[in-house]
Amino acid sequence: MSTFYTVLPILFLAIAGMIMLMSGVFTDRDHSFAITAASIVVLAIAARLLVAAPGGTIFHGLYQTNDFTRFADVLVALGAIGALALSVTFNRNIGITRFEFPVLVLFAVTGMVVLVSASDLITLYIGFEIQSLALYVLAAFARHNLRSSEAGLKYFVLGALSSGLLLYGISLVYGFAGTTNFAGIAHALAGHPTAAVGSTIGLVFVLVGLAFKISAAPFHMWTPDVYEGAPTSVTAFFATAPKIAVFALLLRVMLGPFGPVLGQWRDLVQIIAAASMVIGAIGAIRQTSIKRLMGYSSIGHMGYALMGLAAGTAAGVSGALIYLAIYLVMSLGTFGCIIAMSRGRQPVERIADLAGMASDDPRFAFVLAVMMWSMAGIPPLAGFFGKFYVFAAAINAGLGPLAVLGIITSVIAAFYYLRVIKVMYFDAGEPGLDRRSAGVSLVMGAAAAFTVLFVFHPSTLTTLSTMAAHALMTSQGF
């Protein structure tokens, strides 16, 4: 019976998605709003089921749940709920109000839940592909828009390449370790030097495939184009739930089956983290589109989170999880502001379009300013604490130079975040924006409240992240 309750959230998401798909297909009326609302309820129920699911390993080591997977799954569900709440008015305004949108989000989240809890390379790949197939369609969801079609094609081609590299890496690991089970791989690498050397080669390909999905440099080339070309409601989803799911998987893979060869991959992760922070900071400086700016910003944020992985300690994992949770809130708040940027029901995406917003719409300007300050890491906002925890973990693990580089790139990145604030408060511009929907206002308000008030009660998030990190790092986790 415990096995049933463990997989119940996945069954619930998949069955709910199929029911909504059938209801949309076999009814003549447009039920897109009702299906979107129902999807939000389904995700909330699924999050509750995921928290209540018993821990342990099932299906002969193919699937595992613990405090770490619960933490990541809840973040994924919250990201999807926020993205759906932001999508309703935006999709209607640009003419893509279709019931398939929330259904695809549900199927993508189903894949992410499988992904996060995978304890076998085969399960990992299945979850990876379930997620990817839904995301490919979402990227090109505005099929009559040239930029959206281009974004979908780029994401599909490069995503297929990353999947191929991942699968090739899995085959190499299986060839040298003789198993695809996480516990079996860890045992093989700890006891057989030859297997460790050969499997490390496969690990490089696995790491490349996963780095692509989180937009880590130098595998980031798709991110600015897809962020700009895809509908903003899709971009808001891409920037949150998929990145958290894949990053959680990355933590499990690197510190679980490949934990015994930490010394062989730590330098590579440091290089990827450093490259991501530098490219994210420098690449955004000359951007005029706020969506492309957010694309480069996400590259940098993944670099900071990778510092926690490079530390290879429980404190590093906890710091990375705290950073991801805060990044989730900041991203939803920022994309809520971007979705609210519309005049005459037409989206505006240039940073220059924000000119004069402080006088025309002071509440909007305040929320976006809070998000920008937080992403820049200015105390006492939540973004500062996210960086503080990963920097502290890196320094304690002997990665001082990487932490110093992180501080330098944070200063550089502050330039383009503050430029957005400068445009809103000091430049003259056009009349104000359209009236915001209740869903967008709710997401913006909740994100701003969390970002500002986090300093007064950080213990809840830090305690949960510490429990999750402990579950990942203990020997019984694998």
Swiss-Prot record:
<dbReference type="GO" id="GO:0050136">
    <property type="term" value="F:NADH:ubiquinone reductase (non-electrogenic) activity"/>
</dbReference>
<dbReference type="InterPro" id="IPR001750">
    <property type="entry name" value="ND/Mrp_TM"/>
</dbReference>
<feature type="transmembrane region" description="Helical">
    <location>
        <begin position="33"/>
        <end position="53"/>
    </location>
</feature>
<feature type="transmembrane region" description="Helical">
    <location>
        <begin position="438"/>
        <end position="458"/>
    </location>
</feature>
<keyword id="KW-0997">Cell inner membrane</keyword>
<comment type="similarity">
    <text>Belongs to the complex I subunit 2 family.</text>
</comment>
<keyword id="KW-0830">Ubiquinone</keyword>
<dbReference type="Pfam" id="PF00361">
    <property type="entry name" value="Proton_antipo_M"/>
</dbReference>
<dbReference type="GO" id="GO:0048038">
    <property type="term" value="F:quinone binding"/>
</dbReference>
<protein>
    <recommendedName>
        <fullName>NADH-quinone oxidoreductase subunit N 1</fullName>
        <ecNumber>7.1.1.-</ecNumber>
    </recommendedName>
</protein>
<keyword id="KW-1003">Cell membrane</keyword>
<keyword id="KW-0472">Membrane</keyword>
<keyword id="KW-0812">Transmembrane</keyword>
<dbReference type="GO" id="GO:0008137">
    <property type="term" value="F:NADH dehydrogenase (ubiquinone) activity"/>
</dbReference>
<comment type="subunit">
    <text>NDH-1 is composed of 14 different subunits. Subunits NuoA, H, J, K, L, M, N constitute the membrane sector of the complex.</text>
</comment>
<feature type="transmembrane region" description="Helical">
    <location>
        <begin position="321"/>
        <end position="341"/>
    </location>
</feature>
<comment type="function">
    <text>NDH-1 shuttles electrons from NADH, via FMN and iron-sulfur (Fe-S) centers, to quinones in the respiratory chain. The immediate electron acceptor for the enzyme in this species is believed to be ubiquinone. Couples the redox reaction to proton translocation (for every two electrons transferred, four hydrogen ions are translocated across the cytoplasmic membrane), and thus conserves the redox energy in a proton gradient.</text>
</comment>
<feature type="transmembrane region" description="Helical">
    <location>
        <begin position="244"/>
        <end position="264"/>
    </location>
</feature>
<feature type="transmembrane region" description="Helical">
    <location>
        <begin position="99"/>
        <end position="119"/>
    </location>
</feature>
<feature type="transmembrane region" description="Helical">
    <location>
        <begin position="193"/>
        <end position="212"/>
    </location>
</feature>
<feature type="transmembrane region" description="Helical">
    <location>
        <begin position="121"/>
        <end position="141"/>
    </location>
</feature>
<feature type="transmembrane region" description="Helical">
    <location>
        <begin position="6"/>
        <end position="26"/>
    </location>
</feature>
<dbReference type="GO" id="GO:0042773">
    <property type="term" value="P:ATP synthesis coupled electron transport"/>
</dbReference>
<keyword id="KW-0813">Transport</keyword>
<keyword id="KW-0874">Quinone</keyword>
<feature type="transmembrane region" description="Helical">
    <location>
        <begin position="299"/>
        <end position="319"/>
    </location>
</feature>
<dbReference type="InterPro" id="IPR010096">
    <property type="entry name" value="NADH-Q_OxRdtase_suN/2"/>
</dbReference>
<feature type="transmembrane region" description="Helical">
    <location>
        <begin position="265"/>
        <end position="285"/>
    </location>
</feature>
<keyword id="KW-0520">NAD</keyword>
<keyword id="KW-1133">Transmembrane helix</keyword>
<dbReference type="GO" id="GO:0005886">
    <property type="term" value="C:plasma membrane"/>
</dbReference>
<feature type="transmembrane region" description="Helical">
    <location>
        <begin position="156"/>
        <end position="176"/>
    </location>
</feature>
<feature type="transmembrane region" description="Helical">
    <location>
        <begin position="364"/>
        <end position="384"/>
    </location>
</feature>
<feature type="transmembrane region" description="Helical">
    <location>
        <begin position="388"/>
        <end position="408"/>
    </location>
</feature>
<keyword id="KW-1278">Translocase</keyword>
<feature type="transmembrane region" description="Helical">
    <location>
        <begin position="71"/>
        <end position="91"/>
    </location>
</feature>
